[in-house]
């Protein structure tokens, strides 16, 4: 069994993801099992720039950024499962399916994200994902990654 009950802090996440502020949307990895699932958190702060315009009187964490948070969590799971962090071999986020937004996230919320590998073959990975705030599901989605060899 490949269960790792260890978190990944932001310094370890920096070594895996190329994203940086304001587009790094994973604050901590709570747990994962290689080739199975990963649990992470995104802390919503009023100081983040998108809250100024989405919406100034009623700030709401943008739904597309919930999807991006899921994609970043899935990217971390791909790396932690395969060990691949190679400029010649990349996994591209290529699709979103069956997405539903159930509730909103607002400043001060902590979004718990769980990504689970639903299907995997040589070049395609499909993830089933949920995002939760205060024990309420705020979003469900499936996302697709494709492996591309650059050389």
Swiss-Prot record:
Its EC number is 4.2.1.59. One of its GO terms (molecular function) is (3R)-hydroxyacyl-[acyl-carrier-protein] dehydratase activity. It catalyses: a (3R)-hydroxyacyl-[ACP] = a (2E)-enoyl-[ACP] + H2O. Pfam families: FabA (PF07977). It comes from the Bacteria. The active site is at residue 54. Keywords: Cytoplasm, Lipid A biosynthesis, Lipid biosynthesis, Lipid metabolism, Lyase. It is found in: Cytoplasm. GO terms for cellular component: cytoplasm; membrane. Belongs to the thioester dehydratase family. FabZ subfamily. This is 3-hydroxyacyl-[acyl-carrier-protein] dehydratase FabZ.
């Amino acid at each position: 069994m490949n269960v790792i009950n260890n978190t990944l802090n932001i310094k370890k996440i920096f070594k895996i993801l190329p994203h940086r502020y304001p587009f790094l949307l994973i604050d901590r990895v709570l747990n994962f099992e290689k080739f199975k699932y990963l649990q992470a958190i995104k802390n919503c702060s009023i100081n983040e720039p998108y809250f100024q315009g989405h919406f100034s009187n009623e700030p709401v964490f943008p739904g597309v950024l919930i999807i991006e948070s899921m994609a970043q969590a899935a990217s971390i799971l791909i790396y932690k499962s395969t060990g691949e962090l190679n400029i010649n071999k990349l996994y591209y986020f290529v699709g979103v399916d069956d997405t539903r937004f159930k509730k909103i996230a607002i400043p001060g919320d902590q979004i718990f994200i769980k990504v689970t590998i639903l299907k995997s073959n040589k070049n395609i990975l499909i993830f089933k994902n949920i995002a939760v705030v205060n024990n309420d599901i705020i979003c469900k989605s499936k996302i697709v990654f494709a492996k591309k060899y650059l050389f």
